[in-house]
Amino acid sequence: MAVYTKIKEDFWSIIQEMQTHIPDFVVDPNKHFLRNRKLNFETMLKMTLLLEGRSINSELDEFFDSNLTMPSASAFCQQRAKLLPDAFKYIFDKFNVQYSHSPTYQGYRLLACDGSECLFFPDKNQAEYHTSCNAYATVNSIHLNALYDLLGRRYIDAVLQPKRNKSENRAFCNMIDRLAVQEEQKVIFIADRGYEGYNQLVHIQKKHMYFLIRVKDHPKNGILTSFCYPAEPEFDSIYPLTLTRSCSIQKEYSSSRIYKRISTAHVYDYMDELDRQDYDLNLRVVRIHIGNGVYESLITNLPSASFPASKLKELYNMRWGIETSFRDLKHTIQLTDFHGKKSEFIQQEIYARLAIYNFCTVIKQAIKIEKETSKYKYEVNFQMLVKTCRRFLKEKRDDEWIRKTLEKYLLPVRPGRRYHRKNVHKGIKSFLYRN
């Protein structure tokens, strides 16, 4: 079977399989999607996956090819209210299982963790989602915590949290624990400041994995305040650390270790307060110069023989891949243009967009690009890739069509390019200003 057609059939086969146990994905299994309607279970899933940034009426007109008997926008909203967000999380997860292969870096799989805000229209009945967009406006927000494969360029897992109840550290721990890896597979988690808690580090170490996390540089408050640093601006040192809850029981302390008491107010999943158990953690702290007199500190448990400071700097720089993926997800996949106000609708669309992002990435990786004489490597323009993949999912097109279409939109990859990060005003695109 043709490669692209097989990827498409694998993607839609998930929905076919879901139809054998529909009650698992609906609000009321005794009532919902029991009758045969135009907007049945399969159609609702497919249409939600293919939503773009237009109005619901325009989306319906596109999906049903301007059929005069197509359902109304009201009917669509009523039907989607019967679906659980878990239905789209299931599609996202199952497609990841189908295409789980990922390139490695020196035999290590690189996973980046980061978070992003998804803004939608305010609702006074959803106080846990309220946040301030600016000094004059209040909006609702869901915090998207994502685990991203930097070399495979796919989202591996996601946790959605209300803005006011968000905990990036707890979400990170959940994604670490849920990660299924093959036997003897080596994984490096790469994260930015905000993920430097001891609890997360121990979760990673318990699974025999590795971490590389940027932390607050001394002398600022942070995880490094317990350590004594060398006088040099750049260094690479190992600090044997013992975590403990105890502050009163007599212990025979070792002068070669640093003892850090974990307050009972802090969550620590692997330490029983009653038994007063300790936990040993060896941290490697590396301080590097990134240019213009600016230094950054990294903590890791990677061996220095295989990963000197220069390698760690290169690895951490690769973390930027998750930042560019958020840009593509929000502005190309159109994650910012939601089609509802209810938090359940927003969660549906977030998981649906993540699934479509991964589908486009798998298609992109299957394309063989050959340039006889070229200074740069080339890749497909992501904006045109998304547009083409959506048409490919909706229409009956063959492999030759998608291959020739995408070959027209190749861009050179120029490594090492840098731009100042711009502060962009965050807002919501009103329903009144959509086509």
Regions found by a protein language model. Give the residues of each.
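An active-site-proximal beta-strand-loop segment
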Residues: 130-137
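The alpha-helix within a helix-turn-helix
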Residues: 61-68
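Single, function-defining residue in the core of a domain
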Residues: 1-56, 62, 76-83, 107, ...
